[in-house]
Design a protein with these regions (language model features):
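Membrane-interacting alpha-helical segments
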Residues: 38-41, 79-81, 232-233, 261
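Structural detector for internal amphipathic alpha-helices that build alpha-solenoid repeat scaffolds
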Residues: 43-44, 50-60, 82-93, 113-123, ...
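Juxtamembrane/interfacial segments around transmembrane helices
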Residues: 18-26, 167-169, 257-260
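Short inter-helical turns and helix N-cap capping residues of alpha-solenoid HEAT/ARM repeat scaffolds
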Residues: 76-77, 108-111, 136-141, 167-168, ...
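Amphipathic alpha-helical scaffolding segments comprising HEAT/armadillo-like alpha-solenoid repeats
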Residues: 53, 60-73, 94-105, 125-135, ...
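Structured extramembrane domains adjacent to transmembrane segments
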Residues: 71, 75-90, 96-100, 109-114
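N-terminal topogenic membrane-targeting module
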Residues: 1-74
């Protein structure tokens, strides 16, 4: 049955009349049928990008998939609740149901909290900044990666500057991840400015994003920032730079400023070993 639903979804969402009229799935009236339809919609969303989100939302609401999943979330616990929330994060939900989901953002369960935020963002992309600002939890790599997936599929508008210019640390992190994800070279100066951030997560995200984008490591702000790291933080960062393909010449400023001779030699040996590996 799921294959039949997937074919119907593909035809409706990719045809010239996408989003027009109603698409009903008569066999989805019962609980089992609703679940199969929810899984089919989620599978379609995972496998495709750039489709008409409004048309998909119409299918979800016309067939009561979002209301069904919200009821299952309320009645379930543990992994079953997370499973239903993951499905809802891909199908989206109508605005009237979102307050019931928002309450779950404060859950002690990290997965429940994560998907509560993702559901809000997927259901109302224009409210992404507000949703992230209101999120009380920390923006872990898992949370940011899930948001990036939705962004890649075209669910979320890209506007990194208002995020990074915000005083909210979670928004700053999301803005930095957007720059990293899309490799926005003209935003490098914004990243350099974030090296002065007192927040360790923002500072580290900016530093590693600069490295991923092959930015210059000779700037004074970079050298000073690295000098302020602990021994183990510097060691880990040097290893990352070597893996990213930096040469000893491009890292000369960092090597000259390195106060620990062990790390200076370690950096050079790492770069040389990676060169040998690449032939």
């Amino acid at each position: 049955m799921q294959d039949t639903y997937l074919l119907a979804l593909a035809e409706y969402l990719s045809g010239p009349d996408a989003g027009r009229g109603e698409v009903r799935f008569p066999q989805s009236r019962g609980r089992r049928g609703k679940m199969i339809l929810a899984e089919a919609i989620a599978a379609f969303a995972e496998m495709n990008c750039g489709y008409d989100c409004a048309a998909m939302h119409k299918i979800v609401t016309d067939n009561g998939v979002d209301a069904f999943l919200v009821r299952r979330i309320a009645r379930s616990r543990s992994w079953n609740r997370v499973r239903y929330m993951q499905l809802l994060s891909l199908t989206g939900a109508r605005p009237s149901l979102l307050p019931r989901i928002k309450r779950l953002e404060d859950s002690p369960d990290a997965y429940v909290s994560l998907f509560a935020l993702i559901i809000r963002i997927s259901s109302a992309p224009e409210q992404t900044i507000a949703a992230v600002r209101e999120f009380s939890g920390a923006m872990s790599h898992r949370v940011l990666s899930e948001i990036m997936l939705r962004l890649w599929r075209g669910f979320i508008p890209v506007a990194y500057e208002p995020m990074i210019c915000s005083d909210n640390e979670n928004l700053k992190l999301l803005g930095i991840y957007i720059i990293r994800f899309f490799g926005i070279e003209e935003a490098q100066n914004i990243l350099y400015a974030q090296l002065d951030s007192p927040n360790g997560a923002v500072h580290d995200a900016a530093m590693y994003t600069l490295a991923i984008m092959k930015s210059s490591m000779t700037r004074k702000c970079v050298v000073q920032s690295v000098a302020g790291m602990s021994f183990f933080q510097r060691r880990r960062f040097y290893k990352f730079l070597a893996a990213e393909g930096y040469s000893t010449r491009s890292l000369s400023a960092l090597q000259s400023a390195e106060t620990d001779s062990r790390l200076g030699g370690y950096m050079e040996s790492l770069v040389n070993s990676y060169k040998k590996m690449l032939g």
